[in-house]
Amino acid sequence: MGFRLITQLKGMSVLLVLFPTLLLVMLTGAQRACPKNCRCDGKIVYCESHAFADIPENISGGSQGLSLRFNSIQKLKSNQFAGLNQLIWLYLDHNYISSVDEDAFQGIRRLKELILSSNKITYLHNKTFHPVPNLRNLDLSYNKLQTLQSEQFKGLRKLIILHLRSNSLKTVPIRVFQDCRNLDFLDLGYNRLRSLSRNAFAGLLKLKELHLEHNQFSKINFAHFPRLFNLRSIYLQWNRIRSVSQGLTWTWSSLHTLDLSGNDIQAIEPGTFKCLPNLQKLNLDSNKLTNVSQETVNAWISLISITLSGNMWECSRSICPLFYWLKNFKGNKESTMICAGPKHIQGEKVSDAVETYNICSDVQVVNTERSHLAPQTPQKPPFFPKPTIFKSDAIPATLEAVSPSPGFQIPGTDHEYEHVSFHKIIAGSVALFLSVAMILLVIYVSWKRYPASMKQLQQHSLMKRRRKKARESERQMNSPLQEYYVDYKPTNSETMDISVNGSGPCTYTISGSRECEMPHHVKPLPYYSYDQPVIGYCQAHQPLHINKAYEAVSIEQDDSPSLELGRDHSFIATIARSAAPAIYLERITN
């Protein structure tokens, strides 16, 4: 009985172990199921470019990323993604979505990134994005949205990036971004916005970059951007802006970049830039500006880059404040400013026209202090030219005046430049002294620590110089000496001297060196026929033998007809050899 009970318990234990294992395997297999025509990479599902008209089935509930880009989805139904509660990002761009149900995003509360760009969405319900309060990135660009609901983005307190580019928006509702307190980037470019309400951007305390380019604004008042303390860049290019004004009662110290290019700005109100003390980059090209006032350029105290080309500059006395400001400006600037008037200087560069026609010759420059100090920021450059004020001839003589000239400098800045130069000289001298001291210290330590090595180096250098000198002397000794040659032209008298006396003068010459005379002893008895030279000169290393023996005849044969006394004895023999120290003569007998 006990044995059977033990056996049954063992069987049950095996089943209890196997059943959960099989169940776990089945659940795992179900979770890893990948829809047809899709690609699954772990917890990421890619169902792209397969003309899906609806959301594919069998998508794992544990998926964290789903891409449905480049398909044919036309509508997002209610609870469309309810089973994907682990989803973190969802890409639905480049479809044909025109309708989005109010509850389409129910059940995916953890969603952080939603891309709906490049669709045909014309309307979004007020509560469309309420089920996804954790969104960080929302892209609605390149759709056909005409309006935004007043509570369109309510509850999106964690939203950082919002794209509304290339829609058909005409207005921005008041306080529509009130809850987007962490928004960092907002793009409203390429819409049909004509105006902005005073509180359109209320609540965007952390906004850093705002795009409003390619809209239909006709005027801009900085009062429309209330207390955007962290805004660094605002882009307003290619609108229809005719005037720029400011109604701020506070200093907008955070703004560094302002792009107003491609508008219809004809004039800038004096004092417009006083509220922007830290403005560093300003684009005013492709407008209709004719001049810039002295008060305006005085407010450009922190600029490091400016573009002014493509305007209708009037090259008269009104251009002088801007001309002198640009002349002293040390940052990046556009140099292609062209005169639009008067007619006789149209098409000429502003700088050339002013200097050629002495337009500003009677304008006096007075150095003034800044009316206010800009708050210090990390991005502010350490030094910029001080603004100047231009006066007419009516300025009292008590003021210090400087007439414009090519070498014009602002008074009061020389000391600053001298101070900087003096410090640079001191720093350079100290650096040079320390470098020399370090080199000498290294040499001294090496000499003290390794004296034998230093001596060896010196001896090695000395031996090397000696070897070099020895090689040079050897090269000089072994250089090829000049060739020897013998030019022997015996006359009849010399021949007779040799025949009778047994000796005669013989001269050989070392070209370019010296001459010597050596006697050649010949026995008087034999006679020689001069088919070959009588003597051989200048042997080098080996004796030079006359190849043919001399033909000697006895005195008894003196009357023989074979003796030809009329032979020509002016035969010339020249022998050339390499130089050799030993030279001797040898006669070969028959």
Swiss-Prot record:
Localization annotation: Cell membrane; Postsynaptic cell membrane
Keyword tRNA processing found: no
Main localization, broad class: membrane
Domain LRRCT intervals: 311-362
GO cellular component, as recorded: AMPA glutamate receptor complex; extracellular matrix; extracellular space; GABA-ergic synapse; glutamatergic synapse; photoreceptor ribbon synapse; postsynaptic density membrane; postsynaptic membrane
TM region(s), chain numbering: 425-445
Keywords in alphabetical order: Cell membrane, Glycoprotein, Leucine-rich repeat, Membrane, Postsynaptic cell membrane, Repeat, Signal, Synapse, Transmembrane, Transmembrane helix
LRR repeats: 60-83, 84-107, 108-131, 132-155, 157-179, 180-203, 205-227, 228-251, 252-275, 276-299
Listed GO MF terms: heparan sulfate proteoglycan binding
Membrane topology note: Single-pass type I membrane protein
Sequence ranges assigned to domain LRRNT in this UniProt record: 31-59
Cytoplasmic face residues: 446-590
Expression (tissue specificity): Expressed in the brain (at protein level).
InterPro entries found in the cross-reference section: Leu-rich_rpt, Leu-rich_rpt_typical-subtyp, LRR_dom_sf, SLRP
Coiled coil: none
Extracellular side: 31-424
Range of residues in the leader sequence: 1-30
Residues bearing attached sugar chains per UniProt: 58, 126, 291
BP terms from Gene Ontology: AMPA glutamate receptor clustering; neurotransmitter-gated ion channel clustering; positive regulation of synapse assembly; regulation of presynaptic membrane organization; regulation of synapse assembly; synapse organization
Similarity field: Belongs to the LRRTM family.
Known role: May play a role in the development and maintenance of the nervous system. Exhibits strong synaptogenic activity, restricted to excitatory presynaptic differentiation.
PANTHER family reported in the protein's UniProt record: AGAP008170-PA, LEUCINE-RICH REPEAT TRANSMEMBRANE NEURONAL PROTEIN 2
Quaternary structure and partners: Peripherally associated with AMPAR complex. AMPAR complex consists of an inner core made of 4 pore-forming GluA/GRIA proteins (GRIA1, GRIA2, GRIA3 and GRIA4) and 4 major auxiliary subunits arranged in a twofold symmetry. One of the two pairs of distinct binding sites is occupied either by CNIH2, CNIH3 or CACNG2, CACNG3. The other harbors CACNG2, CACNG3, CACNG4, CACNG8 or GSG1L. This inner core of AMPAR complex is complemented by outer core constituents binding directly to the GluA/GRIA proteins at sites distinct from the interaction sites of the inner core constituents.
Protein known as: Leucine-rich repeat transmembrane neuronal protein 4
Species for this entry: Rattus norvegicus
Species lineage: Eukaryota, Metazoa, Chordata, Craniata, Vertebrata
Gene from which this protein is expressed: Lrrtm4
